[in-house]
Amino acid sequence: MAITFGTSLPSRGEMAGPEQLRSVAQRAEDLGYDHVWVSDHIVLPKKVDSFYPYAADGVATFRPNEPYYEPLAALNFIAGCTQRIRLGTHVLIIPYRNPVLTAKILSTLDVLSGGRVILGAGVGWMEEEFQAMGLDTYKERGAVTDEYLQLYKELWTKENPSFQGKYYQISDSGFEPKPVQKPHPPIWIGGHTGPAIRRAAKYGDGWMPIGLRPPAILDPEELGGKIARLRKLTVEAGRPEDAVSLTFSTGVFFDDSSGSSREMMHGRPEQIAADLRQYQDLGVSNFIIGLQGSTVP
């Protein structure tokens, strides 16, 4: 099983900027990384009561007055700065954008980059952001996401796309160019919840949860149980058991941790490698590593 490694780009916060994006992406490519990733928020309300699923207290640490680059625009920029490395969204919040326009941007990016796009897809968690964007679909965001993913595939793969859904309808329209990747750019579903796993089993080419960030621990034992659930649901959806590839996203902290109190992904390089092998043994073939630091190499 081939193993790939990727890392997140500084597309938000105090490190965000054109030179930083270019520098980290090119350095990652030079070092042999396989993919780079950008995340997605469009407007950050200053008062947020929605529960953030990747913090123990449910409070996100985003700062509304700091830059947060639009991910598809950022990836177009990165495509022009690199030659080989794959370009991913981690994750694109699918309900936020017109689905036909989104499919067009992704298809164009795939063509112009030579087939390097990975669509990491999620439903979103911040109700206040939906409201700020004039969207009333927060409570239906899962159903909207499922429908839009089906529409993307229709547009990307059919010569005469036609789609009649609850949230979007289209017929008798041309849609070109088609993506370079066939049948379409891989769709990796983000999230660790039951609905996310069901979505990956039915619509995804990959599943990409974030782990080791309370309350989403996803240590090897917990992740193994969720993978078994994913495989079962994939077969029930009429697909091969191994149709959905496995990705694990985590922060890595290099320090001198040792002994029984050492946390996973904390420690010396050989300890980190041993931790990663535990996930590899579960069938994980792609790792997205968040390297911790405050300066750009």
Map each language-model feature to its residues.
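Active-site-adjacent structural elements that line small-molecule/cofactor binding pockets in enzymes
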Residues: M1-P297
